[in-house]
Amino acid sequence: MGFYAPAQIVRDARDHGVNVLHPDVNYIGWDCDLEPQSNGELALRLGLRQIKGLRQQDAMLIEQNRKSGYSHPRELISRAGVQLSTLELLARGDAFQSMELSRRQAFWTVRGIANSTFDSLTEKDSGLPLFSNNKESYSNKTSHSEPKVSLPIASIGEEVIDDYNTLKLSLKSHPLALLREDLSGSSYKAISILENLADGSPVLLAGLVLVRQRPST
């Protein structure tokens, strides 16, 4: 919408009662779309276009080959034909939530796929007949080869930073919400209380610069 950044539009929509959902490989394609909810209302699902660096062509392949859904990130390679680099972008964008994978779990899983691919290529190049009579597909082979690990849970601050780095917005929290308690004890004021202050009262405001207007006015 021209001058307005996606973060501003999403924030305004949520302030007006619109349920906004995260981009997910099992629910959306390139563009944002309305998604029916169990309560009969419509939610706004953000499109994969919101993920920094993701190509429209890859988003279209993911949507076209989704069918009944993806159950594991590797299926986006075997069915949609996307590259490992695309899986990494999707993992960083936290787009595997429908698979019950957090951002860290998804990235760990994708790196496991990358390592399995490298090992397979190395074995083939060595001339060993390891796969010559093996009827198992690559996807079946790797489905049981990933180690089970317990990854540390990211803090809400880390999640918000990662969201802004990949999506340029966050549905989990607002950066200033994490600082509000520290700021409230100083001269910084919330916009919601400005109308109650006496005329001429000195105040400090804290906020995010989403768009730099050029030339400035």
Q: Which residue ranges define each predicted feature?
A:
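Noncatalytic, beta-rich nucleic-acid-contacting surfaces in large DNA/RNA-processing enzymes
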Residues: 1-217
